[in-house]
Amino acid sequence: MEKDGLCRADQQYECVAEIGEGAYGKVFKARDLKNGGRFVALKRVRVQTGEEGMPLSTIREVAVLRHLETFEHPNVVRLFDVCTVSRTDRETKLTLVFEHVDQDLTTYLDKVPEPGVPTETIKDMMFQLLRGLDFLHSHRVVHRDLKPQNILVTSSGQIKLADFGLARIYSFQMALTSVVVTLWYRAPEVLLQSSYATPVDLWSVGCIFAEMFRRKPLFRGSSDVDQLGKILDVIGLPGEEDWPRDVALPRQAFHSKSAQPIEKFVTDIDELGKDLLLKCLTFNPAKRISAYSALSHPYFQDLERCKENLDSHLPPSQNTSELNTA
């Protein structure tokens, strides 16, 4: 351990293979030499430092992640450690040590044989996804980049959210890479560069919900404007009252369109599933369903998991006041 309480990654973890590379840096599968050689996932991030050392925002974000870890929520990936690799006057290389899960939702969907994911499995996975998201939101943590690649699926079908609450930690690394972050799961308010909060994650959930049925993305745009156009082709052009006022792109830039039946794009979805999907894919974030409300949606009424006490994994609301609201 160093004086800042962070471990030295090169002393405890032995890299086995590189398992991913994205906008945020490289991800390695490694052995934890101090814990029986268990496999972990190492995410390496470069953080810009100044005369005062590591930015307060980064320290705060790490503190939030460590606080969330104390709850050991079943639908949130475990954060075992935060380590430093090396330091210079300009940057510190952080290594975030997470539990290792062999596959993400993208891999899972690719492997599923015809005719696709059973509807009851989709329902179960959606419930777990929403339960993990509600936990994050109850701590005022917005995921911001929810997509199948950072939803992990264990061999027993357990869903775990990964890569949440890391936007500030990753911001410096993102400036150094040319990797394009996918637009396909981004909410309209993000594409329009409007202000946003927790509802952005529910839009992403809607896109992922549809993809579980389709096994391919619902909206596949090539730019912010193209992505928005593809969204409006399906859900229709919203009224003037629902268009955000703090954006440069006016509603008039898009042709007037009516909403198309969602079952045209998402076959095999039942009426209750369709209702939940449309509540997630609501253009106006103020009218979009919350994760907490979605857990009580009639779509889940026949799911055995719903009989469990949802509050058993939720922190007391009064404990969120000291947490990061960014």
Curated annotation (Swiss-Prot):
State any GO CC term. Answer: nucleus
Q: What is this protein called?
A: Cyclin-dependent kinase 6
Q: Which Gene3D superfamilies match?
A: Phosphorylase Kinase, domain 1, Transferase(Phosphotransferase) domain 1
Supply any other comment: Over-expressed in some leukemias and malignancies (including sarcoma, glioma, breast tumors, lymphoma and melanoma) as a consequence of nearby translocations.
Statement: the UniProt record of this protein carries the keyword Acetylation: yes
Q: What class of enzyme is it?
A: transferase
| MF terms in GO | ATP binding; cyclin binding; cyclin-dependent protein serine/threonine kinase activity; FBXO family protein binding; protein serine kinase activity
The primary location reported for this protein is cytoplasm
GO terms classed as biological process: astrocyte development; cell dedifferentiation; cell division; dentate gyrus development; DNA damage response; G1/S transition of mitotic cell cycle; generation of neurons; gliogenesis
Q: Could you state what the record's PTM comment says about this protein?
A: Thr-177 phosphorylation and Tyr-24 dephosphorylation promotes kinase activity.
Q: Which gene encodes it?
A: CDK6
Query: Which disease appears in this protein's record?
Result: Microcephaly 12, primary, autosomal recessive: A form of microcephaly, a disease defined as a head circumference more than 3 standard deviations below the age-related mean. Brain weight is markedly reduced and the cerebral cortex is disproportionately small.
Q: SMART domains of this UniProt entry? A: S_TKc (SM00220)
Spell out which residues are annotated as carrying N6-acetyllysine: K264
Cystine pairs: none
Organism per entry? Homo sapiens
Q: Which UniProt keywords apply?
A: Acetylation, ATP-binding, Cell cycle, Cell division, Cell projection, Cytoplasm, Cytoskeleton, Differentiation, Disease variant, Kinase, Nucleotide-binding, Nucleus, Phosphoprotein, Primary microcephaly, Serine/threonine-protein kinase, Transferase
Q: Write out the catalysed reaction.
A: L-seryl-[protein] + ATP = O-phospho-L-seryl-[protein] + ADP + H(+); L-threonyl-[protein] + ATP = O-phospho-L-threonyl-[protein] + ADP + H(+)
Q: Which residues carry this modification: Phosphothreonine?
A: T49, T70, T177, T325
Expression is induced as follows: Down-regulated in response to enterovirus 71 (EV71) infection. Induced by NANOG during S-phase entry.
Q: What function is annotated for this protein?
A: Serine/threonine-protein kinase involved in the control of the cell cycle and differentiation; promotes G1/S transition. Phosphorylates pRB/RB1 and NPM1. Interacts with D-type G1 cyclins during interphase at G1 to form a pRB/RB1 kinase and controls the entrance into the cell cycle. Involved in initiation and maintenance of cell cycle exit during cell differentiation; prevents cell proliferation and negatively regulates cell differentiation, but is required for the proliferation of specific cell types (e.g. erythroid and hematopoietic cells).
- Does this UniProt record's set of keywords contain Nucleotide-binding? yes
UniProt-reported outcome of changing P199L: In a metastatic melanoma sample; somatic mutation
